[in-house]
A protein has these predicted regions:
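Strand-helix-loop interaction patch of compact alpha/beta domains
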Residues: 1-57
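A structured beta-alpha segment of the ubiquitous adenosine-cofactor-binding alpha/beta core
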Residues: 389-425, 431-434
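Compact alpha/beta protein-protein interaction domains typified by the UBC
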Residues: 34-99, 108-112
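Glycine-rich adenosine-cofactor-binding loop
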Residues: 322-365
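N-terminal charged helix/coil linker that caps or initiates catalytic domains
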Residues: 273-334
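Glycine-rich phosphate/adenylate-binding loop
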Residues: 143-297, 422-426, 430-596
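Domain-level detector for trafficking modules
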Residues: 87-98, 103-144
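Glycine-rich phosphate-binding loop and adjoining beta1-alpha1-beta2 segment
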Residues: 363-399
Length: 596
């Protein structure tokens, strides 16, 4: 027997002894009873009788990971509590929630404490307490009571108003967006082009007060009464849907919980349920008895049934971000110049963060030598980097409203279209080529209208011993202020006695994906701060690799860095350093125009 199996056997034995000594009338659950509760023979359990006039049982269940997991409890013979707060499907009690911690060295104490918590919850539910939890965790209680397995996937703005929206009816799910254009863009990004997709009206109803389970509608008539009682101006939107829908329509309820979180719940409304007769029966007319178009919406609703369904929010990831950041970034436009190992990873981080419009620009093809440190893999070799990245990112991040590839250099792009970068909120130059980036810097300072946005330059020092993110605006210090005329930085962070070999294609860059990750995060983080107005150019941040990384390649901290910014010692740190204007820099001689 393995170590963990032995530990479990010992823990279960201790719990069994505690149950026998503590709970009168308790019974061990046999395999058949465990299966009836949705568990297999790898579980152990007991039936613990509940005292009091209402009786019933409490099932104590230990999973295969016990004692390195929490005990579970489920109600038995208590149908009166199956819709009570903190009671989940099949009577399971929600006590500690996901991720609850246990004293894994004292299984009996954990079970005893959890048993007391379960009894306290049952007593509170019997007394009618905890009802405010329905509004705190509304979406979870709605999911508990769904009556149709078809989910609604939504991508909707959290606006506190009712309105008609657009729906695509698929076989596996319905997709709901603010309008047909947004729905088509998301579906095309995720699943590819399909010209046969059709879109229908759906209703989004803002509820000023979220309902408790006994008010959850089980037909369209009850849904209408709920809207009438709980939604300001939601009834005209619902009635319009009732008057114009065909066989089936979707309704999304949206509201704010007691903690301020915006939640969604779904409803499918359809025609009357006619039993199948095996023959072609006439289609029931929900408007019978009225002239066409004159049936009252209340009658149309009463004659239709509804099903509660789960809502799967395709923007749920925004809930893992700081409030409002995702919505702000969704409206930003970014251009990424250079889609190598650095640029590809930064682009991915920005899309994951919610940036809604992005153009990737790179003339080069992806080679086998970069498979180990690029977002692309071996299936993309010999393809243009920008094009391959866009094709990969579109289904991964369908929320992006515009994701475009330009398989050329930025110079060629601007010769073809001088306003190609005109509307960008931020330009990221991750080319790592002094000639191209000094040209971009001079163009920004030229006073023309081709580059209006701030430019965020990012580069790695040799062997990824340090990484730099430098934001330059139309005024103040420029890129050249910190470099010599041929692109040698004035104050490098590292020095390398043994340099990488240089061939006709330029120097070989020695670093792997792990070395690259902090640099990508550094640049993406500053990009987000710039887009959200939390930082402004000129600003430079640097990542200094752990000292053993330098030592492995024979590198060390550069004396000039130590003189200016102090000794990094063991490294492994992020630092912000000045980027002062150089009075002798040529930018002082160039015409400068400040663009708002």
């Amino acid at each position: 027997m393995s170590f963990l199996a032995t530990k479990r056997q010992q823990a279960v034995g201790l719990v069994a002894a505690w149950v026998a000594a503590t709970v009168e009338g308790a019974d061990r659950l046999n395999p058949a009873l465990l299966r009836a509760l949705g568990r297999d023979e790898s579980w152990d359990g007991w039936r613990l009788p509940l005292r009091g006039a209402r009786g019933g049982d409490l099932h104590l269940l230990l999973d295969p990971e016990f004692p390195y997991s929490l005990p579970r409890f489920a109600l038995g013979r208590r149908t009166d509590l199956l819709r009570a707060p903190h009671v989940e499907t099949k009577g399971r009690l929600c006590l500690a929630g996901d991720g609850g911690r246990a004293d894994t060295l004292d299984p009996v104490a954990v079970v005893a404490y959890s048993f007391g918590e379960a009894l306290a919850l049952i007593a509170e539910d019997e007394a009618g307490a905890n009802r405010e939890d329905y509004a705190i965790d509304f979406d979870a209680y709605w999911r508990r009571d769904v009556t149709d397995p078809l989910p609604l996937r939504t991508c909707l703005h959290a606006e506190r108003r009712s309105r008609l929206v657009s729906a695509w009816h698929g076989q596996a799910f319905y997709f709901i967006a603010e309008n047909a254009r947004d729905a088509r863009t998301w579906l095309t990004n995720r699943y590819g082009v399909d010209e046969t997709r059709a879109f229908k009206n759906a209703a989004l109803i803002w509820l000023d007060r979220l309902p408790e389970p006994e008010m959850y509608p089980d037909n369209a008539g009850r849904a209408r009464r709920l809207i009438e009682a709980s939604s300001y101006r939601g009834l005209p939107v619902f009635d319009r849907l009732m008057a114009t829908m065909a066989d089936r329509a979707a309704v999304v309820f949206m509201g704010a919980t007691a903690t301020g979180d915006v939640v969604q719940a779904g409803l499918l409304v359809e025609g009357p349920d006619w039993a199948s007769t095996g023959t072609k029966a006439p289609k029931p007319n929900v408007s019978r008895g009225f002239r066409p178009g004159n049936a009252p919406p209340s009658i149309l609703a009463l004659r239709r049934r509804s099903h509660r369904v789960e809502v799967q929010r395709t923007d749920a990831w925004l809930g893992r971000m700081r409030a409002g950041e995702g919505a702000q970034l969704a409206g930003k436009r970014v251009a990424v110049l250079g889609c190598g190992s650095l640029g590809g990873g930064v682009a991915k981080l920005l899309l994951q963060s919610g940036v809604g419009r992005m153009t990737l620009i790179d003339p080069d093809t992806f080679a086998w030598v970069n498979v180990g440190r690029h977002e692309l893999g071996s299936d993309s070799t010999e393809r243009n980097k920008a094009t391959a990245l866009v094709e990969r990112f579109r289904p991964m991040y369908p929320h992006a409203r515009e994701l475009r590839a330009e398989p050329t250099s930025w110079q060629v792009l601007l010769r073809r279209d001088p306003k190609a970068l005109h509307d960008c909120d931020l330009i990221l130059s991750l080319i790592g080529d002094w000639n191209a980036e000094s040209a971009l810097n001079d163009l920004q300072r030229s006073g023309t209208d081709e580059v209006r946005a701030a430019i965020l330059y990012g580069w790695l020092e040799e062997q990824a011993g340090a990484a730099h993110a430098l934001a330059i605006g139309p005024t103040g210090a420029c890129l050249r202020c910190g470099f010599g005329p041929t692109g040698t930085i004035h104050v490098p962070a590292t020095t390398w006695p043994r340099h990488a070999p240089v061939g006709c294609g330029g120097p070989t860059s020695i670093y792997g994906a792990v070395d690259l990750a902090p640099a990508q995060s550094l640049i993406a983080s500053l990009a987000i701060d710039l887009l959200l107005g939390r930082a402004s150019p000129p600003i430079r941040r640097a990542w200094l690799a752990p000292q053993p990384t330098l030592a492995q390649g024979g590198g060390c901290w550069h004396l000039r860095w130590i003189e200016h910014y102090g000794d990094p010692l063991q490294g492994g740190k992020l630092t912000a350093t000045p980027w002062p204007k150089d009075a002798a820099c040529s930018c002082a001689l160039l015409p400068v125009t400040s663009f708002s």
